[in-house]
Design a protein with these regions (language model features):
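Conserved strand-to-loop turn within each blade of WD40 beta-propeller repeats
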Residues: 1, 34-37, 133-136, 193-196, ...
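WD40-repeat beta-propellers
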Residues: 1, 40-44, 140-144, 199-203, ...
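Blade-loop segments of beta-propeller domains
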Residues: 4-31
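A structural motif specific to WD40 beta-propellers
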Residues: 5-8, 51-55, 151-152, 210-212, ...
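WD40/WD-repeat beta-propeller blade N-cap
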Residues: 10-17, 58-65, 156-173, 214-221, ...
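Loop/turn segments within WD40 beta-propeller blades
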Residues: 20-28, 69-74, 121-127, 176-187, ...
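Short loop/turn segments immediately following beta-strands, especially the blade-tip
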Residues: 44-50, 146-151, 246-252, 334-342
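Blade-level signature of beta-propeller repeat domains, shared across WD40, Kelch, NHL, RCC1
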Residues: 313-342
Length: 342
């Protein structure tokens, strides 16, 4: 039995909440909330209750429908890499009036006599950032969760050499994922989907030019998810297809692996199981679909919900999947459980 210890407004009731997000990197019992009131707040759940005052409030002045994204690190990201990051900090620093053309790299050496990798001074700590659609809804902004300050802005109106990707009028940023490819030397990357069906892949070291622009969808991109190895992903849109793709950081390419056509359009949410074996989608047709992520073939269609499915996600141990719907239900599923290697 689940008991509710406290209920109160964390954002204005008139505006509502866009998203909630949690991660081990935020700290024990902490989560982020994103409201349509233009704020992102960090909360603490202590002793079974929710603190009345947020630990941190970011006033983004962003009023939109795009959900925030915390950093996804590859499952191969080891503790030794984090220790190295604490000794040899790589930071991006904004110069001037938040002009993205003046975003320059600064390398800071943490004093060796401080020694301990536990020190927060000078740590690269890529997990201390959050990405969201900006005050200008076509832009992506990255914010520092320690200082509540804007770290970078990524514009959408960039020149494109691709014949099938327009260089302007992409519209609003509709979905995004902040991630950390193994090949990026500890620098943040962002994959953003836009209203015109295009996606831009960014490396924050070069905020003026994306790694690559692609257009896999004909309607607004509603969801993107990067896999646990940060080597590929899946996207859903308001059109009638799901796209699985690879991401090659060394060559700067995003290539379609599998395109899945749907009988009914509309995918609100996508998720890839942490072990990289399964992918799930949440559809406008009230259905949750399960796919073999590596091969792209359909495995199951779940017909439990009675209204539009808005979101789907997997637990960190790959054992449980959760789906949410406009029918005001959240369902927990145990499907194709991972094999116990013991």
């Amino acid at each position: 039995m689940v008991s509710i210890s406290s209920i109160f407004w964390i954002h204005s009731a008139a505006h509502g909440i866009i998203a909630l997000a949690s991660s081990a990197s935020l700290g024990t019992n902490k989560f982020l909330s994103q409201g349509r009131d233009g704020t992102v707040k960090l909360w603490d759940i202590g002793d079974g209750g929710l603190s009345r005052i947020p630990h941190l409030t970011i006033k983004t002045n962003s009023y939109h429908f795009c959900k925030l994204s915390l950093v996804k690190k590859p499952i191969t990201w080891s503790k030794s890499k984090e220790e190295n990051a604490s000794r040899d900090c790589l930071r991006m620093e904004l110069k001037g009036n938040s002009d993205t053309e003046n975003l320059e790299l600064r390398r800071e050496e943490t004093p060796s006599n401080h020694g301990s990798s536990e020190s927060s001074e000078g740590k690269a700590c890529p997990e201390e950032y959050v990405a969201l659609s900006g005050e200008q809804p076509s832009e992506v902004e990255i914010w520092d969760l320690k200082s509540a300050k804007k770290f970078a802005q990524l514009p959408s109106n960039i020149p494109s050499s691709s014949s099938n990707v327009c260089d302007k009028n992409r519209g609003m940023c509709m979905a995004l994922q902040l991630f950390l490819p193994s090949e990026s030397q500890g620098f943040l990357n962002v994959l953003a989907g836009y209203e015109d069906g295009s996606m831009l892949w960014w490396d924050v070291r070069n905020p003026g030019t994306p790694v690559t622009p692609v257009k896999f969808h004909s309607e607004p991109v509603l969801s993107v998810c990067i896999d646990g190895f940060c080597k590929g992903g899946i996207s859903g849109a308001a059109d009638d297809k799901i796209v699985m793709y690879s991401l090659e950081h060394s060559t700067g390419t995003c290539m379609v692996k599998r395109e899945i056509n749907l009988e009914r359009p509309g995918i609100s949410g996508t998720s890839i199981r942490p072990d990289g074996k399964l992918a799930a989608t949440a559809g406008w047709d009230h259905r949750v679909r399960i796919y073999n992520y590596r091969k792209g073939n359909a495995l199951a269609i779940l017909k439990y919900h009675h209204a539009t499915c808005n979101a789907v996600t997997y637990s960190s141990d790959s054992k449980i999947m959760a789906s949410a719907s406009e029918d005001a239900t959240v369902a927990l599923w145990e499907l194709y459980p991972p094999q116990n290697r013991n």
